[in-house]
Amino acid sequence: MNIKRNKPNILITGTPGTGKTSLAGVIASNNEMNHIDISSAVKEKELHDGWDSEFQCYILDEDKVCDEFEDVMVKGGNVVDHHGCEWFPERWFDLVIVLRTDIKILNDRLEKRNYNQHKITNNLDCEIMQVILDEARNSYKQEIVVELPSTTLEDNENNQNFISQWIQNWYEKNN
């Protein structure tokens, strides 16, 4: 099913601590789009199957999340952020951004969040093994998946500029 939208949908994904939520919020605000923070929505709207005490997070119910956001996503104009990406419907997104962060910086960010050592190690391993990038490449058309560095403030500014320019190009092609 190919649905014509007036605004694009963008997924910003990456290992926890790569700056997804911050970047998604800025992009949504600067481009008059909606920011959908999946992790917050899972908690607030009870889109989960309980609590995972080992990883200290809710166990996301993918079907509940998809049902909750289907109508919103069909309309377009959304910037979604989440550390997982392979379970979203492919039709939802026009651009998939995978943020990557230097391991030392990522470790520092996760420690500041007071993550336990098991959770930090698991997330660092995911970043080293590029798990999220591989999931994105295996789940979406190659031409919509873009890997961006997210280690420095300059990276963040460059990413904002890249995505904003991409949005402008999308409007020119689609409206």
From Swiss-Prot:
Query: One GO molecular function term?
Result: adenylate kinase activity
Binding positions for ATP per the UniProt entry: G17, G19, K20, T21, S22, R113
Please give the GO cellular component terms listed in this UniProt entry: cytoplasm; nucleus
Q: What is its EC number?
A: 2.7.4.3
- Annotated segments matching region NMPbind: 37-60
* GO biological process, alphabetically ordered: maturation of SSU-rRNA; response to oxidative stress
Location in the cell: Cytoplasm; Nucleus
Q: What class of enzyme is it?
A: transferase
Q: Which InterPro entries match?
A: Adenyl_kinase_AK6 (IPR020618), P-loop_NTPase (IPR027417)
Q: Which family does it belong to?
A: Belongs to the adenylate kinase family. AK6 subfamily.
Put simply, this protein is called Adenylate kinase isoenzyme 6 homolog
Report the source organism: Dictyostelium discoideum
Query: What lineage is on file?
Result: Eukaryota, Amoebozoa, Evosea, Eumycetozoa, Dictyostelia
